[in-house]
C-alpha cells in the first residue's frame, strides 16, 4: 500500500547556508527567520516556481529576467509538511523519495533520518517505529545550495556531480539552476517479504511465440515463497506461470503462442500487455508489482556494407529492419519538477505525428519522468537513452574523479535497473559527445565508459550500449571514406551549393545529431522580447536577441539568401524556410542511402525555454515550425524526393528522383512524374515514367535533365504512386546569382479561399483554394486567439493557381503551466483558424 505526500499541504522557506541547522543565533538565542517567510509550494515541484507564485521573482522567461533569479541556487531551502498518519496496512513502513534535486537533509518528527546527494536515484528510510507510534507526522527536507557545476562551456574531466547540466547555461537555454523535490514522495507499507530489483522483458522466438520473462529478488524470509506471473491483454488472461524463489531470487517466463506484436511508430500497432507479479507465501499474498509490456523482438545488426570494425546501428524489430526517423530531445523545461503530464503528452504526440520512431534522450539533460517512457511505449517511439554526461567544449574527456565515479555508478545503476522495464527502451549511450582526446570519440577502454558498459551488461544486456554519441571513429562526417560511422553535425545550413555537396556525398552509417537554426514565430517574440526588439537584427547588434539565441543567429545567412528583410514577420518566414530546406535535404540524403545509413536523429525537437532563435522544430509554446512539417514529409513511410546539388543551377538542371519506402516489397510498380513550374502555374518541363521496384528501402527511379528556365524562380514538383500509396514533394530554385530567393518575397499576393467543410470534437477539416494568378507559397495554419493548441495534419504547403488542398486541423484547449499559468484563460467558442501564405505580413494576422 502507498500514500503519496503530493496530496499534502507543503510550505517552503529560503535561508542562508547552515541557518536551518543552527536554528538560533549564538549571540541572542533567538530563532533566525530566514531569507523568505514560509510560502506555499507543491510537491513534486521546484523552488523557482513557488517563489514566482509568491511574488518573490519576476517572470524569468521574459527579457533578461532570469539574471534576477540566479540568487536562488545559492541559498538553502526548507520544505515542510505536517499530516495525519494515513491508514496503511503492513508490518514495515518506508519513507521513499523518488527524486530530490540535489543535496537533501531529511527530518521526520524532529529526528534526523539522513542525507542524500543526487537527483536521479530514489532513496528511502525505514520509519516503522515512528509511523506506528505517532498520529501526526512532520516531514522537513532541507535542500542545500546547488553545487557549482559546468555549463555548456568548461571541462568535462572536472565534472563533479550527477546534476543536470543544461540549466547551468546551454545554447538553447538560460541559467536557471533547478532545486526542489522534483518527483513524488511516498510512504510505502509492506509485509515481511517484498519484491525487489524487478526486471520484466519480452522476446519472440523464431517460431513466433511471445515470451514474457521476469526476474527479481525477494527481500525478507518466508515459507513456500513463489512469484506468480500473469499476462493479460484487454483484461483477458493470456499466459501465467509460477516462479519458485530460491536463495532470495526468482526467474522464469510465460509464453504466448500467437502474440499481438509491438511495433515502432509507423511500422504497426503498439499493443501493451498487463504484466503482474504477485509474491505469495503459501496462499498468502505479500506483494504485487504491475508493468505494461509490448511483446517484441529487438536485435542490433550491422549496416549494409559497413566497415568490419563498425558497431551495429541498424535496429531490427520482430525480424524487420526499421529505418530510424528520430529526434533529439532536451528536457521540456528548466523547472522539470513542475511539468504536468499533459505537457509531456502534447509534446510526444506531436513527435509521433511527425512520423518519429526514435527519441534520443540527451546526456546533458535528465533521466526523464516515468510518464515520458510510458508515453513512448504507447506511441511506439524507441528511446536511445544517454547516461548523464556531456561535452564541455574546452575538454570533453569523461571525468574519472573517484567521487564522481561513485555518483555516476549509483545514479546510472538505478536508471538502468528501472528504465529496462520499458518496451520503448532500445539502446544506451555513455553520454553526449565524450572524447578520448581533443577530437576523437571515446571508446569502451576508458574507465568511465567501461564502468557504464559493465552496468548495462549486468542489468539489461538485451539493450546495446554505445560508448558515446557520436561514437565515431570520426566525430563529424570525414573526407576520408569509411571512418564516419555514427557522426554528429552539421548544426547549420552550410550555404549554397556547399550544403548539398557535403550531405549529398556523405557516407556515414548513422547521424545521431544534426540540425539547423530558425527564428521562432512572432508570437514567441511578443511573449519574451520587449517591443523595441521586435525587429530583424543580428544577435551581435541586439542584447535581447543575444541573450536568448547567441549561438544561432541566422540573420547573415538569411539576408544573404533573401536580401534585406523589412520586418520581423518577414525574417521569421525567411529563416524558417531555410531551416526547413536545410533539414529536409539532410534527412532525405541520409534516407536515400538506407540501409548503409540506418537513421537520422534531428537536433533538436523541443526547447526548455522560449528562445527567439534556436535549432528546435517544436517551440516552447507548442508551435511547430516549418522544419517540423518538412521533416515530417521526409519521414513519411512512402516518400518521393529529389536529389540536387544547388538551388541555382546554371545552364542545365541535373538531378534524380528517388522513392523511399518502409515497406520494401519487391515487384511493385511505381508511376513517377515530375514537372518544373513557373510561379503562375505554367508547366515549363515535365516527365513521366514507370519502374518495377526492387526490394530495397530507397530506389533511384529517374534522372532529370533539362535546360534551366528563363524565369527568375521556379519550382520542381516530383510525385510517385504505387498501388494505394502516393506522395509528392516540391522544391524551389532560382536563376539569380545573389540573394537567390529574394524574388520569392516579391511575388504577387495570392488570393486564398478557405472554408470549413467538416467539424468533429477536436478536429476541423478545411479546404484551401488558390484563386489568384500566382503561387501561394508555404501556406501556414494559425490559430489567432491563442486559446487553442492546434496541430494541422500538414502545414506550410504550396498551392499553384487553381489548386486546392483539404487540411485536417486537430485542436484542444491550450493549457498553461509553470511561469505562464497566470495566463490560464479558458477557451471560449471555437478556434479562430486562418491560413496565411508566405511571407508573413503582420506580427499577428
PLM regions: where:
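Active-site region of glycoside hydrolase catalytic domains
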Residues: 196-198, 213, 287, 294, ...
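Beta-strand-rich binding/interaction modules
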Residues: 106-108, 209-244, 652-692, 699-702, ...
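Extended acidic/polar, glycine-enriched regions
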Residues: 132-136, 215-304
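Terminal connector regions
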Residues: 281-289, 705-745, 812-845
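Substrate-binding clefts and catalytic carboxylate motifs of secreted carbohydrate-active enzymes
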Residues: 12-20, 42, 177-180, 428, ...
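Active-site-adjacent substrate/metal-binding segments within catalytic domains
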Residues: 54-84, 89-96, 101-108, 114-117, ...
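Accessory beta-strand-rich segments of carbohydrate-active enzymes
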Residues: 3-5, 11-20, 46-54, 69, ...
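Intrinsically disordered, low-complexity Pro/Gly/Ser/Thr-rich segments with frequent PxxP/GP/PP motifs
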Residues: 242-260, 682-711, 788-814
